[in-house]
Amino acid sequence: MSQKVANRSIVFYNSQSPPSVITEELDLGNCFSPSELVVKIHAAALNPVDFLLQGFAYSWLVGKGPKGFSRDYSGEVVKVGANVKDFKVGDKVSGLFQHLYGKQGTLCDYLILDPSKQPAISKISPVGHPEYDDYVINASWALVFGTAYQALHNYGQNLGPDSKVLVIGASTSVSNALIQIAKNRMKIGTVVGICSKKSFEYNKKLGYDYLAAYDDGSTVENVKQIMKNNMGNEKFDLIFDSVGNSEFFECINDVLKDKCQNSHYVSVTGDKKLNYSNPRIRDSLPGWESIRRIGPFRKYNYKLLLLKPEATFAKIGSEMIAQKQFVPAVDSVYAFEDYSKAFERLKSNKAKGKVVIQISQ
């Protein structure tokens, strides 16, 4: 029996094309395989990486067809294949849909996925947020939470009450998730954040033990003063960079423990702050500092984190939200028809939390 519906998607075609809406007919009766399910999307969050990928979307490299935006989503399962075991029609779910220049993104009415290939999906629990509904909150966290979780867990470190972590870019959405995981779940003893002076009060409430300003004197010296005055000059077990920074490399031995102690410097962007609105390939290339990270020249443990979609972080994130241990940060919510305003908000670099587009209510 035909169950045809209209499926709207926000897409781009290449690096020069503006975002646009396409509408295609989708037959819910036969659009999925036995191993797939169909999610009716209620909300999806924007991520800066989408603009970066579009900036590099040269037609000769990625083809001329439509390419979907976004990865975070929340919604309701409306169809389930015969071989899908863990989900049923009516389940409210959220997750991360990983793709690279695929036609399907999450800014659409219906998302078709195979949970065995897209494992970062979990059932959502009631949130009870005073301002936003459950779908908005649950659309806002998978990518940033997963990134933060893997930064803290994927490199063989056993971080806990005696550990010390430095967060470069304390006000980003990824760092917002990281501080909540670090303090509320892992009970990490000392977390120092770097942010603007005006963000001190906000970040202190999240759980940072000490904050260093990047807009008041030398960032490096401000951190060293915290180490001297509050940490007994002990060095960090982990330096996490969520913005793109190179200030600490010249004095890495002064701030990061020796590599033999399994200390790590983990970055999600590289050594430079990327211009997501106008990305350039040369800004993404490794610099001379990379020589100190490889082979016999390696002076410290460095990782450029590329998020892997995993069921583990999706399950833990959902549990922490239900237990009030993690509150995703939402900056603003826009209707589907106002997607261009949502894009501009994210590009403004003024968003404090995720920018979410509500697909259906």
Swiss-Prot record:
Keywords: Lipid droplet, Mitochondrion. Signal peptide: none annotated. Its main location: other. Disulfide bonds: none annotated. One of its GO terms (cellular component) is lipid droplet. SMART domains: PKS_ER. One of its GO terms (molecular function) is oxidoreductase activity. Belongs to the YIM1 family. This is Protein YIM1-2. The gene is YIM1-2.
